[in-house]
Amino acid sequence: MSSSGVYTCNSCVLTFDSSDEQRAHMKSDWHRYNLKRRVAQLPPISFETFDSKVSAAAASTSKSAEKEKPVTKKELKRREKQALLEKKKKLLEIARANMLENMQKSQEGNTPDLSKLSLQENEENKEKEEPKKEEPEQLTEEEMAERVMQEKLRNRVDIPLEQCLFCEHNKHFKDVEENLEHMFRTHGFYIPEQKYLVDKIGLVKYMSEKIGLGNICIVCNYQGRTLTAVRQHMLAKRHCKIPYESEDERLEISEFYDFTSSYANFNSNTTPDNEDDWEDVGSDEAGSDDEDLPQEYLYNDGIELHLPTGIKVGHRSLQRYYKQDLKPEVILTEGQGTLVAAETRSFLPAFDKKGVQTQQRVWQTERFDKKRLDKRSAKFVNNQPHYRDQLLQ
């Protein structure tokens, strides 16, 4: 090796004519290997020796690669799964490509059809708009009422007398009485004042027309769109009854009743026994007789109804108070109160000595356990948490 060069490598004992050659040598594997040998205090080797060692190492690695371990079942399963996944990916890609091609073809074929459809729709819309312009914009109240009535008559549902008014499945019965019995037991449909009812069939027809024709609830006058909607409302709200509380509600169905028979007792009481003893009475005296009528026949407040017989009929809203059987208050004397207090002592539970002893034992064991725990916890000196302020570190 000549020593005339300016640039040298002490690890490989080489000289270079330029700095570029020196930099290229410093990046080579041969230089790195000689540096490691220098650290291990070994002499440097030549490039031929380094090349032979590299080729020998490559041959040994290839031999070791050939001598692999035997493939296990787990490894085989993993490889099979990987192969299946790759196949699935390929199939999905093929299917996606086919789908895109079909979509493109369908779009190309349907473009003229879409234009035709759009033209047809525009023509239909124009035809619909033309008759709308011809119709009158404003209608009077009478015309509107007539139109609504005609629509209701078209949508009318006739409910026969033998059919239930509230069942959605349209249950039929043999006669009206059986139908009314079913509605009373199943839905609570009760006809008030049946004693004075004259036209039962007319009342049922009126209720059926109110539900079937008007689609109106018989209690709250809720109006539904269809018969089914009204029936569902009445079943849900328990409005399957004839309202008979206010004066307007009674007047609504008054044409089906006749209460003239209820005044028979009053007329019989006022008629004289002997018709021969009639006397002419002036108008002033007749008016005074009317004023002397007992108040029981005329008095009727919002809570109780006073009948001519003297019976008082209560309102249904106060039914729970009428059902109460309250005993009258009895004021006891001092001696009677003392006797009652003495009698009630017998209802006290008897003194159980064994039960008291058992309770005392339980309390004793609880106190003993608590003392033992306190004693054990006091033995540990380092039982308090340590606090270290981080700012003072």
UniProtKB/Swiss-Prot annotation:
It holds the Pfam family zf-C2H2_2. One of its GO terms (cellular component) is preribosome, large subunit precursor. Residues 64-82, 123-136 have a biased composition (Basic and acidic residues). Signal peptide: none annotated. Residues 55-82, 102-145, 268-293 are annotated as: Disordered. InterPro entries: Matrin/U1-like-C_Znf_C2H2 (IPR003604), ZN622/Rei1/Reh1_Znf-C2H2 (IPR041661), Znf622/Rei1/Reh1 (IPR040025), Znf_C2H2_sf (IPR036236), Znf_C2H2_type (IPR013087). GO terms for molecular function: sequence-specific DNA binding; zinc ion binding. Its main location: cytoplasm. Residues 102-113 have a biased composition (Polar residues). A zinc finger (C2H2-type) spans 7-31, 162-187, 215-239. It is found in: Cytoplasm. The modification Phosphothreonine is found at residue 140. GO terms for biological process: budding cell bud growth; mitotic cell cycle; nucleocytoplasmic transport; ribosomal large subunit biogenesis. Present with 830 molecules/cell in log phase SD medium. Associates with nascent pre-60S particles that have not yet entered the translating pool, and is released from mature 60S subunits. Interacts with pre-60S factors ARX1 and RPL24. Interacts with JJJ1. Belongs to the REI1 family. This is Cytoplasmic 60S subunit biogenesis factor REI1. The lineage of its organism: Eukaryota, Fungi, Dikarya, Ascomycota, Saccharomycotina.
